[in-house]
Swiss-Prot record:
Record CDD domains: DSP_STYX (cd14522)
Motif Interaction with FBXW7, chain ranges: 76-78
Residue numbers spanned by region Disordered: 197-223
Organism: Pongo abelii
Protein's GO biological process: negative regulation of SCF-dependent proteasomal ubiquitin-dependent catabolic process; regulation of ERK1 and ERK2 cascade
Entry protein name: Serine/threonine/tyrosine-interacting protein
Function of the protein: Catalytically inactive phosphatase. Acts as a nuclear anchor for MAPK1/MAPK3 (ERK1/ERK2). Modulates cell-fate decisions and cell migration by spatiotemporal regulation of MAPK1/MAPK3 (ERK1/ERK2). By binding to the F-box of FBXW7, prevents the assembly of FBXW7 into the SCF E3 ubiquitin-protein ligase complex, and thereby inhibits degradation of its substrates. Plays a role in spermatogenesis.
InterPro entries in alphabetical order: Dual-sp_phosphatase_cat-dom, Prot-tyrosine_phosphatase-like, STYX-Interacting_Phosphatase, Tyr_Pase_dom, TYR_PHOSPHATASE_DUAL_dom
Length: 223
C-alpha cells in the first residue's frame, strides 16, 4: 500500500489547576476533552439534572447490558439526545463493532456545539473503553497513551482485559481505515496492482521451478 501521511489534531493538554483525585470523585463525571465527559450512571440520574444542565450536556451515551436496563435508564429523553448500547462488561464482548457509531455520535454532537456524557454503570470499564477508543482514533494515539490521558482526568478507570486487548488491536484497524479513506482512486488502483503483481511474480516463480524440474527429469531419461 502506498505511503499516505495521516494528520491528526493536537491533543488538548491537561489543565494546570486540575483537582487532586479523591475517592468520592468516582461517583461524579469528569471532562476528558472539551465537551466530552466520562462518568458513572449516578452522574446521569434524575437527581443530577441540574448538574448536567450546568455543564451544558446535550448528548448522552448510555452503555448497559439487558439485565441492567431496569435501573440504568435514559432518564431525560425529552431533554437530551441518547445513544443506548447494550454491552456487557465481559472480556469476550465484542466492542470494536460499536466504535464507529459512537465516534460518529460524539463528533456530530461536538461539531454542532454540544457536549457529550459517556456513562456505563460505574464509569470504569465499558464507558472508559469507548472514550479511550474515541481519543485513539481522533488524535492518532496508541492505546497506552490514550489510557494515560483519560486516567489523568478520571483516575479510577480500569477496562477489563478483553477490552484492553481489543483497544490494542483497534490501533491497526483505525489506521488502515483512515489510510484507505485518504487514498485517491489512483493510489488504491496502484496498491492493488502492486499486490497483484507480487502474487503474479510468485506464481511465475513456482511455474518456472516446475518447468526446470521437468527439464531435469527429461534430460535424465534421455541420458
Amino acid at each position: 500500500m502506498e505511503d499516505v501521511k495521516l494528520e491528526f489534531p493536537s491533543l488538548p493538554q491537561c489543565k494546570e489547576d486540575a483537582e487532586e483525585w479523591t475517592y468520592p470523585m468516582r461517583r461524579e463525571m469528569q471532562e476528558i476533552l472539551p465537551g466530552l465527559f466520562l462518568g458513572p450512571y449516578s452522574s446521569a440520574m434524575k437527581s443530577k439534572l441540574p448538574i448536567l444542565q450546568k455543564h451544558g450536556i446535550t448528548h448522552i451515551i448510555c452503555i448497559r447490558q439487558n439485565i441492567e436496563a431496569n435501573f440504568i435508564k435514559p432518564n431525560f429523553q425529552q431533554l437530551f439526545r441518547y445513544l443506548v448500547l447494550d454491552i456487557a462488561d465481559n472480556p469476550v464482548e465484542n466492542i470494536i463493532r460499536f466504535f464507529p457509531m459512537t465516534k460518529e455520535f460524539i463528533d456530530g454532537s461536538l461539531q454542532m456545539g454540544g457536549k457529550v456524557l459517556v456513562h456505563g454503570n460505574a464509569g470504569i470499564s465499558r464507558s472508559a473503553a469507548f472514550v479511550i477508543a474515541y481519543i485513539m482514533e481522533t488524535f492518532g494515539m496508541k492505546y497506552r497513551d490514550a489510557f494515560a490521558y483519560v486516567q489523568e482526568r478520571r483516575f479510577c478507570i480500569n477496562p477489563n482485559a478483553g477490552f484492553v486487548h481489543q483497544l490494542q488491536e483497534y490501533e491497526a484497524i483505525y489506521l488502515a481505515k483512515l489510510t484507505i479513506q485518504m487514498m485517491s482512486p489512483l493510489q488504491i488502483e496502484r496498491s492493488l496492482s502492486v499486490h497483484s503483481g507480487t502474487t503474479g511474480s510468485l506464481k511465475r516463480t513456482h511455474e518456472e521451478e516446475d518447468d526446470f524440474g521437468t527439464m531435469q527429469v527429461a534430460t535424465a531419461q534421455n541420458g
